[in-house]
Amino acid sequence: SPYPNGLDEKVYLELLKKVILGDFNPEQVVLLEVEPEKQNTKIDFYYAKRDLGIPIVCVTEVSKEKNQLFYRNAQGEKIRIRRIYNRVIFDELHARKDLKLQFSFEDLLDVEWAGHPNWYTRISKFILPYLHGPYFIETTLLSELKSIPDDLENYVLKPLFSFSGAGVVFHVKKE
């Protein structure tokens, strides 16, 4: 099974809902991203919307009143955001000087996080070398590689702290 700890799809989705929704109505929980419709990972967002019932919201569509955040649903109604499933990568956010946000991630906000905004650097590719099992590809940090393999056509290089396919090298050469 591709699900952790031998879970089946139904039990896994129930657990995922508990983790991401917490105690809130799905309409009050948002998947937050920078221009989500333009992201290479948008398929993940659509599945989250389908399976969890949560809206996909761009950071520029969030408004702030005092310490509370809001978005407008498909009917144009203002909905308070109670919990955020954060998909914003701050390297991208800081590089996008054209974005006009009405709040800062550094603000003291009356909102819960389904995963802290900085966790992506800890639970991303960094942990891959430490995961073992039939559903994990063998991964080695380049700095820990003892010798260069002869069959480089079977390898891919991926920068540790990049995102959405940036910097991937498919045709690896010894140079």
Question: Where are the predicted features?
Answer:
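Domain-scale recognition of functional cores that engage charged ligands
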Residues: 2-175
